[in-house]
Every structure is written in C-alpha cells, then in structure tokens.
Amino acid sequence: MKIVRGALAGTLESSDLLVRISPKEDGLELVLNSEVIHQFGPHIEKVARDCLARLGITEALVVIEDKGALDCVVAARVQTAISRAVDEWNPDWSALS
C-alpha cells in the first residue's frame, strides 16, 4: 500500500496516542514522542514498525505522540491512520492477527 495523503488517528488523552502519517518518498521515518520513552520507547517503535511492515508500508512519515497506550492501542491507531491515508484499503487481515 502507498500513503497518498496525510491522516490522523487517536487522541492525546491518557492511555492513548495520536498517530500522524503522511507521504514520504524516500523510505520510512518514525518519530516517537512519549511520556514513557525511556522505559518503553523501543518497544512502542517496534510495535508500530511491525504493523507498518505487515501492511506493506515502506515509504511514509509517521509521528506518534504517546500518552501511555498499550500495544493493542498502538497497533489499532497505526492501522486506522494507514486506512485513512491510502486510496484503497484492502488489508490482509490474517497478517494483522
């Protein structure tokens, strides 16, 4: 899938996160801002990158503003942002399980 427009998913409420995704031509860039970055930053980034990889996203700018979200919330917000940023949303649901 190719990111064709900017999109948002999530909130800045406690235990949630806001994902901003936009087109980028030269690879994947992930920017993480988190209240718990020193404890969980690498893990949050891994969950987000795994989700992006499973959906075939190789070129995008992804900015995550985390407020202590669980893994399932990170994955859900990344998937939702992607679904809003592509022209045709036909994911392989088995790859997301």
Curated annotation (Swiss-Prot):
Signal peptide boundaries: none
GO cellular component, one term: cytoplasm
Keywords annotated in UniProt: Cytoplasm, Phosphoprotein
One Pfam entry name: ACP
Compartment(s) of residence: Cytoplasm
Positions bearing O-(phosphoribosyl dephospho-coenzyme A)serine: S14
Source superkingdom: Bacteria
Function, in words: Covalent carrier of the coenzyme of citrate lyase.
UniProt family annotation: Belongs to the CitD family.
Complexes and interactors: Oligomer with a subunit composition of (alpha,beta,gamma)6.
Protein name: Citrate lyase acyl carrier protein
Record lineage: Bacteria, Pseudomonadati, Pseudomonadota, Alphaproteobacteria, Hyphomicrobiales
